[in-house]
């Protein structure tokens, strides 16, 4: 009953390495990168300022939206969720992800000016 946080984290990492498919690990690495980029932008905003506000806002919105799209892709590609997405093959999910990213970045570039 008295498991420490370190033991729980160690168990989680062992289980993640053993049971998570390689495709999901790549998506998780992408999500971690996007999360760290968003945190970096937010810290820069807090410490330095938001002088070109449109640039900051579009970059931060791009990070948040990219993270959401990545999570949606991970949900659709995960084999454990195949019953929820029975009519969507992984290739279609990836194509939807790419299309949504293109639209997102067109909107972001338009917002920058």
UniProtKB/Swiss-Prot annotation:
<comment type="subunit">
    <text>Component of the oligosaccharyltransferase (OST) complex.</text>
</comment>
<dbReference type="GO" id="GO:0006487">
    <property type="term" value="P:protein N-linked glycosylation"/>
</dbReference>
<feature type="transmembrane region" description="Helical">
    <location>
        <begin position="93"/>
        <end position="113"/>
    </location>
</feature>
<dbReference type="GO" id="GO:0009408">
    <property type="term" value="P:response to heat"/>
</dbReference>
<feature type="topological domain" description="Cytoplasmic">
    <location>
        <begin position="74"/>
        <end position="92"/>
    </location>
</feature>
<keyword id="KW-0256">Endoplasmic reticulum</keyword>
<comment type="similarity">
    <text>Belongs to the DAD/OST2 family.</text>
</comment>
<keyword id="KW-1133">Transmembrane helix</keyword>
<dbReference type="InterPro" id="IPR003038">
    <property type="entry name" value="DAD/Ost2"/>
</dbReference>
<keyword id="KW-0053">Apoptosis</keyword>
<keyword id="KW-0472">Membrane</keyword>
<protein>
    <recommendedName>
        <fullName>Dolichyl-diphosphooligosaccharide--protein glycosyltransferase subunit DAD1</fullName>
    </recommendedName>
</protein>
<dbReference type="Pfam" id="PF02109">
    <property type="entry name" value="DAD"/>
</dbReference>
<keyword id="KW-0812">Transmembrane</keyword>
<dbReference type="GO" id="GO:0006915">
    <property type="term" value="P:apoptotic process"/>
</dbReference>
<comment type="pathway">
    <text>Protein modification; protein glycosylation.</text>
</comment>
<feature type="topological domain" description="Cytoplasmic">
    <location>
        <begin position="1"/>
        <end position="30"/>
    </location>
</feature>
<dbReference type="GO" id="GO:0009409">
    <property type="term" value="P:response to cold"/>
</dbReference>
<comment type="function">
    <text>Subunit of the oligosaccharyl transferase (OST) complex that catalyzes the initial transfer of a defined glycan (Glc(3)Man(9)GlcNAc(2) in eukaryotes) from the lipid carrier dolichol-pyrophosphate to an asparagine residue within an Asn-X-Ser/Thr consensus motif in nascent polypeptide chains, the first step in protein N-glycosylation. N-glycosylation occurs cotranslationally and the complex associates with the Sec61 complex at the channel-forming translocon complex that mediates protein translocation across the endoplasmic reticulum (ER). All subunits are required for a maximal enzyme activity.</text>
</comment>
<feature type="transmembrane region" description="Helical">
    <location>
        <begin position="31"/>
        <end position="51"/>
    </location>
</feature>
<dbReference type="GO" id="GO:0008250">
    <property type="term" value="C:oligosaccharyltransferase complex"/>
</dbReference>
<feature type="topological domain" description="Lumenal">
    <location>
        <position position="52"/>
    </location>
</feature>
<feature type="transmembrane region" description="Helical">
    <location>
        <begin position="53"/>
        <end position="73"/>
    </location>
</feature>
């Amino acid at each position: 009953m008295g498991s420490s946080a370190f033991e729980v984290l160690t168990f989680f990492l062992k289980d993640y390495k053993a049971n998570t498919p390689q495709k999901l690990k790549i998506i998780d690495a992408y999500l971690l990168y996007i999360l760290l980029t968003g945190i970096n932008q937010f810290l820069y905003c807090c410490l330095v300022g938001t002088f070109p506000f449109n640039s900051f806002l579009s970059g931060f919105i791009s990070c948040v939206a990219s993270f959401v799209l990545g999570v949606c892709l991970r949900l659709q590609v995960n084999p454990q969720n195949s019953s929820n997405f029975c009519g969507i093959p992984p290739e279609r999910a990836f194509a939807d992800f790419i299309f949504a990213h293109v639209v997102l970045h067109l909107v972001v570039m338009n917002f920058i000016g």
